[in-house]
């Protein structure tokens, strides 16, 4: 069974969201998603300063098995990306909830977080 930290919010498309304060949220992919994808070989991240809409594809994770779109779980402006992934994409596999984060978003509308799942609901969704 996948590790699903209870302090995070989740999208059905397997992204997690962590509140960093001041309306900024870190985003990554779940342990379940990285297990399905396999070993990461490249992560194409969004441009800092770009605006993204909830549900829009904004990054790509490429593994030995497949390339998979990563979707913005909330709308807002990309304020940071994890540059460590340029040389170490495997961090997405080894530490998906910590060092393997992908990007940070300054939320345009924090009420969109209400559309995301808590840990129990996400676990139920992936176990179906």
From Swiss-Prot:
The modification N6-lipoyllysine is found at residue 65. PROSITE patterns: BIOTINYL_LIPOYL, LIPOYL. Binds 1 lipoyl cofactor covalently. The keyword Phosphoprotein does not apply. Coiled coil: none annotated. SUPFAM superfamilies: Single hybrid motif (SSF51230). Its cofactor is (R)-lipoate. It holds the Pfam family GCV_H. GO terms for cellular component: cytosol; glycine cleavage complex. Residues 24-106 form the Lipoyl-binding domain. Keywords: Lipoyl. NCBIfam families: gcvH, PRK01202.1. The glycine cleavage system catalyzes the degradation of glycine. The H protein shuttles the methylamine group of glycine from the P protein to the T protein. Belongs to the GcvH family. The glycine cleavage system is composed of four proteins: P, T, L and H. This is Glycine cleavage system H protein.
């Amino acid at each position: 069974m996948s590790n699903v930290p209870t302090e995070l919010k989740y999208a059905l498309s397997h992204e997690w969201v962590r509140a960093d304060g001041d309306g900024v949220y870190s985003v990554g992919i779940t342990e379940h998603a990285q297990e399905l994808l396999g070993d990461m070989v490249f992560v194409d991240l969004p441009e800092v300063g770009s605006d993204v809409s909830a549900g829009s594809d904004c990054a790509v994770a490429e593994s030995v098995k497949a390339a998979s779109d990563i979707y913005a779980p909330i709308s807002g402006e990309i304020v940071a990306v994890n540059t460590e992934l340029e040389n170490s994409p495997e961090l997405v596999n080894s530490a998906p909830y910590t060092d393997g984060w992908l990007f940070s978003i300054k939320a345009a509308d924090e009420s969109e977080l209400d559309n995301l799942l808590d840990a129990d609901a996400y676990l139920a969704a992936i176990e179906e």
